[in-house]
Amino acid sequence: MDKVKKPVLTEKTIRLLEKKQYSFDVDLKSNKTEVKHWIEKFFNVEVRAMNSHRPPGKKKYAGSIVTHSVRYKRMIITLKPGYSIPLFPNE
């Protein structure tokens, strides 16, 4: 499961959990097909839709040189009815 790095838990993503939408940080070079395959195989669920976006990297200053931190890709995954992903141990 090297393409999917970690689940994202923010206020917005917790609201999306009610709609069966889960948010994950994934490898920058991965595409929707690869991530869909990994999610379906690892969690034994069926994916209905996927949306992806790349949040901007943060600037780092080293004297007069400006670099950007490592960027990542975030996927919002919508599951078919009847499926869920246990993100918390009590689920």
From Swiss-Prot:
Stored PROSITE patterns: RIBOSOMAL_L23
Keywords assigned: Chloroplast, Plastid, Ribonucleoprotein, Ribosomal protein, RNA-binding, rRNA-binding
Keyword RNA-binding appears in the UniProt entry: yes
GO CC annotation: chloroplast; ribonucleoprotein complex; ribosome
Molecular function terms from GO: rRNA binding; structural constituent of ribosome
Keyword Ribosomal protein: yes
GO biological process: translation
Compartments where found: Plastid, Chloroplast
Pfam families: Ribosomal_L23
HAMAP family named among the record's database cross-references: Ribosomal_uL23_B
Oligomeric form and interacting partners: Part of the 50S ribosomal subunit.
Function, as annotated: Binds to 23S rRNA.
Family: Belongs to the universal ribosomal protein uL23 family.
Protein name per its UniProtKB record: Large ribosomal subunit protein uL23c
